Amino acid sequence: MKFLIDLIFEQLAGAFERAGFDAAYGKATLSNRPDLCEYQCNGALAAAKQYHKAPIQIANAVLDALGENEMFSSAEAVMPGFLNLKISEDYLASYLREMAQAPHYGAQDDPAACTIVLDYGGPNVAKPLHVGHLRSAIIGESLKRIYRFFGNHVIGDIHLGDWGLQMGLIMAQLQDEKPGLPYFDPDYTGEYPAEAPFTISELERIYPAASARSKEDEAFAARAHEETFRLQHGERGERALWQHILRVSVEDLKRNYDNLGVSFDVWLGESDAQKYIPQMLETVKARGLCVESEGALVVPVQEETDAKEVPPCILVKSDGATLYATTDLATIVQREQDYHPQKYMYLTDKRQNLHFEQVFRVAKKAGLVSADTQLGHIGFGTMNGKDGKPFKTRAGGVMRLETLIADVTDYVTSKIKENQTVSDEELPQTAKCIAMAALKYGDLSNLPTKDYVFDLDRFSSFEGNTGPYILYTIVRIKSILAKYGKPVSGAQLLPPESAEQKQLMLVLSRMSDALWTAYRDSAPNAVCAYIYELATAANKFYHDVKILTEPDERRQASYAALIDLTRGVLETCIDLLGFSAPERM
């Protein structure tokens, strides 16, 4: 289905053309004065200069050319040259009837849909997920769903931090704590144990202890570097121990991400890119892009059009060590071979904007990707506490992600118990649904690039622009439909008879347009803005229109069909945001 706004443009473009003006001036927008009209066209104002006519003359000429049109119940030219438009009730009902029957409620696949690698998550193994990992996971999961909704083949890759010094630190600490382990015995030739010699809790204790110790103990730090070297050069014991670290960590990560309703298609990491580094470096060198700078191998990426300095991208340090840029470029080589994507999207903290700008420029200059491959980075803002600083525990430490989820769920559970509207059997699942809505909507309703304040009281409120308010609207519609008790599939959506009904129908008609905006801009906040407007219109409609006591059966069936369509659209949209609605609240 075409967007309603595009259908309006087709009518206005034809009228502008018939009146002797360029059709492009027929673009319409939502009215910023809904008390006067629903849509408006300012094309006459823009055309006045080109055609040396007063805007109101042009507007009147276009209005005459438009004539009687079934799309509009009213069209008028007003000073200084606006065209004010109201959609015909019959046309609006017809549009929604078609929308209700169409796949995806009329939203169509992007004609340019392609294969997209979406790189999000990015946790380090052997470390617990904390609140700093929340935004990448939540935004990434939503974008993955939105991209797929419009027909793209999306590969979600977690890109684990599973290589480097952190591994050597853990191994050196383990060697001191458990010296009898066979992994550190150079003479050991047998099979290594199938079970890991540690739990996830032990791992999460060992790493920070080792990291702190390395800053005080030079000999220990040197041993950690030696263990890292041995791992990266394929020593049998270190490799076996590393596999245990990876397995135990990934099992815990999967449990935590599953608890958040986030999933990944590919669980690869920095380690998987290592074998592609020589090939990548050879390609970059062959292009003549590398220069030596103080013993390091770098690629200058500054361009004449840059307003500020963009430093060279360092590929190999003077001591031979590689960096994140090296790994990211090698990962691109790997992904090109495995997936042949037409688009890459990376989600990280916005402090990495420069890093990705450097990486993308090297990838293009070296021909690691084709000239028309899209390379994109979304740098997200910080989740802050009410003090405006990065969110912490009450003790001032970094809060674990599972602690945050538990805190939000407990808070929501206590609110549900106060209302006593849910049975004990349904309580855990209902609380989880509402907690996820509070947490995810609270994040996603903000522009990804902006910082936001985490406010549990506000995010979990059942009123206002919140996830629980959206869920409340869906659950209330389900309750009304259950009381109505008849199938709505065969009901005819009739033209609106009240302002509240028409407003709800107008908002419904904009679903595809709103979701396309979210897709085009990689901005889930556009989905949130849309469903808040839709939920508000729905609540006003069923508050002012007595659906269950309506005596006219045909009209009542139409009301039921309308709110059922609203429910379906809302549920489609919250699925794109990564949460779902309970049966009761």
Residues covered by each model-derived region:
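Short, charged, solvent-exposed linker or helix-capping segments at domain edges/interfaces
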Residues: S94-M99
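A short, compositionally biased domain-edge/stem linker segment
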Residues: Q101-G106
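Non-catalytic interaction-recognition regions
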Residues: M1-A93, A107-M585
